Amino acid sequence: MAKKVNAYIKLQVKAGQANPSPPVGPALGQHGVNIMEFCKAFNAKTQNLEPGLPTPVVITVYSDRSFTFITKTPPASVLLRKAAGIKSGSGRPNTEKVGTVNRAQLEEIANVKMPDLSAGSLDAAVRTIAGTARSMGLNVEE
């Protein structure tokens, strides 16, 4: 018989830098999960990613206090900011442009994000990422 699921916890944790301090500790502690066990497993799984890159993770907590987790790809906005070399997006994206990204950068980001996107092709994924870039106030060069 399958284990009974108690909770799903969604967090964004910096790759390779999970520790028991907030937000990880309180979120896992209230469900009785061994926090250090999660931190060690998460850090081991994300060691090949760039350290400090925010990584979404979905933790499934079972009734016997065991857990499994799935890491996702970093948010498109973080990857776009890194590609454009900016600190934050524009407060007024339609009037105030803060940077530029080209097609090659969009394709690179789309390749990274492809497992988490519902796009059927790379071209559709690039268009999705380009829309995110425009909404952040970035110029998109074709």
Curated annotation (Swiss-Prot):
Keywords: Methylation, Ribonucleoprotein, Ribosomal protein, RNA-binding, rRNA-binding. Transmembrane segments: none annotated. This is Large ribosomal subunit protein uL11. GO terms for cellular component: cytosolic large ribosomal subunit. InterPro entries: Ribosomal_uL11 (IPR000911), Ribosomal_uL11_bac-typ (IPR006519), Ribosomal_uL11_C (IPR020783), Ribosomal_uL11_C_sf (IPR036769), Ribosomal_uL11_N (IPR020784), Ribosomal_uL11_N_sf (IPR036796). Pfam families: Ribosomal_L11, Ribosomal_L11_N. It comes from Hahella chejuensis (strain KCTC 2396). The keyword RNA-binding applies. PANTHER family: 60S RIBOSOMAL PROTEIN L12, LARGE RIBOSOMAL SUBUNIT PROTEIN UL11M. The gene is rplK. Forms part of the ribosomal stalk which helps the ribosome interact with GTP-bound translation factors. Belongs to the universal ribosomal protein uL11 family. One of its GO terms (molecular function) is structural constituent of ribosome. It comes from the Bacteria. The lineage of its organism: Bacteria, Pseudomonadati, Pseudomonadota, Gammaproteobacteria, Oceanospirillales.
